[in-house]
């Protein structure tokens, strides 16, 4: 995602923070409603977590696609409507005395706007063990589809027990010599279909009741220190890479001072309305039961529609 060379408005109707499926959907609806809108995105490429999804087979009308391609289609749609994008990370969101909003970017730019839509999604949760930070990008990865090709014919580990971890293990097994699937519990949490596929893949070895204590290597990962959660027994596990898939953390630091968060998530219904008038939310960052591409897209549409009827953004 390349930041546009453009003049910053004195005041926007709507600033959308994040260009995942929720943010892009909202941008399309806002532009079609003739709002003066801009999308802020901190990552080099938009699309949110969707770009890391190897296969998307439940998005209506596109039974055989992947998250990266779908994200590109979403972004192309928004750009075809001339939605402006700016590459900037949001440090703070605060309310002005007149009820409008001020957004401060890491670039130092201040964006004034009548309304805000938070669509920042969630980021990768970390293990918090020695070696994770120092070896990031040197064998430590959070995206199998991004980095898996670097480990062809090598032995790797995947940490986690949910759908993402199982999908990562299966994806890596196609090119790696061996894949260890490490989970802190006895039973996996992923869907039964994925569990069966993992069980039937000879290259995958499941290590239940196991945690990673340390990620080791001089310049690149060469082994892990793992421990049994029951006995506490530790041992070394030789691997060339580790793929961490232990969940997500909502990206809400920028609004923590203006919203009462629920375990980091923004409290809101499908209309995206928060406790703060003029501040809306959409996608995985809000409290909800189902976090998928289709629900994020719906959130974006719903929040902008509600915004049009409940705020002065269109005035």
Regions found by a protein language model. Name each.
Residues 1-10, 309-315:
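Conserved small/polar residues in nucleotide/adenosyl-binding loops
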Residues 4, 123, 128, 133-150, ...:
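FAD-site-proximal beta/loop scaffold in flavoenzymes
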Residues 12-81, 155, 160, 166-192:
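Beta1-alpha1 glycine-rich phosphate/pyrophosphate-binding loop at the start
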Residues 47-48, 113, 126-127, 166-167, ...:
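Glycine/Thr-rich phosphate-binding loops of Rossmann-like dinucleotide-binding domains
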Residues 78-105, 110-113, 174-270, 311:
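A Rossmann-like FAD-binding core segment of flavoenzymes
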Residues 109-112, 119-200, 206:
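Predominantly flavin-linked oxidoreductase catalytic cores and closely associated redox partners
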């Amino acid at each position: 995602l390349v930041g546009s060379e453009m003049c910053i408005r004195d005041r926007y109707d709507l600033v959308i923070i994040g260009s995942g499926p929720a943010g892009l959907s909202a941008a399309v609806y806002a532009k079609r409603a003739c709002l003066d809108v801009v999308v802020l995105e901190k990552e080099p490429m938009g699309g949110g977590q969707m770009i890391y999804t190897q296969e998307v087979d439940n998005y209506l009308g596109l039974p055989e696609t992947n998250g990266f391609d779908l994200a590109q289609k979403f972004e192309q749609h928004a750009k075809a409507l001339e939605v402006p994008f700016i590459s900037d990370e949001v440090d703070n969101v605060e309310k002005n005395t007149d009820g409008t909003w001020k957004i401060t970017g890491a670039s130092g730019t201040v964006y004034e706007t009548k309304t805000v839509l938070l669509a920042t999604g969630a980021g990768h949760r970390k293990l918090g063990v020695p070696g994770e930070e120092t070896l990031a990008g040197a064998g430590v990865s959070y995206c199998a589809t991004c980095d898996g090709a670097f480990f062809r014919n090598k032995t790797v580990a995947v940490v986690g027990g949910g759908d993402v971890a199982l999908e990562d293990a299966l994806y890596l097994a196609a090119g790696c010599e061996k894949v260890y699937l490490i989970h802190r519990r006895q039973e996996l949490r992923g869907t039964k279909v994925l569990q069966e596929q993992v069980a039937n893949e000879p290259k995958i070895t499941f290590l239940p009741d196991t945690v990673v204590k340390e990620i080791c290597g001089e310049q690149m990962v060469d082994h892990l220190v793992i421990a049994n959660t029951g006995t506490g027994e530790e041992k070394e596990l030789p691997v060339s890479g580790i793929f961490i898939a232990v969940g997500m953390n909502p990206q809400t630091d920028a609004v923590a001072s203006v919203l009462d968060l629920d375990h980091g998530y923004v409290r809101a219904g499908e209309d995206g309305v928060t406790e703060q008038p003029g501040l809306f939310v959409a996608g995985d960052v809000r409290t909800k039961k189902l976090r998928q591409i289709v629900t994020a897209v719906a959130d974006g549409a719903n929040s902008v529609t509600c915004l049009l009827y409940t705020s002065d953004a269109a005035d």
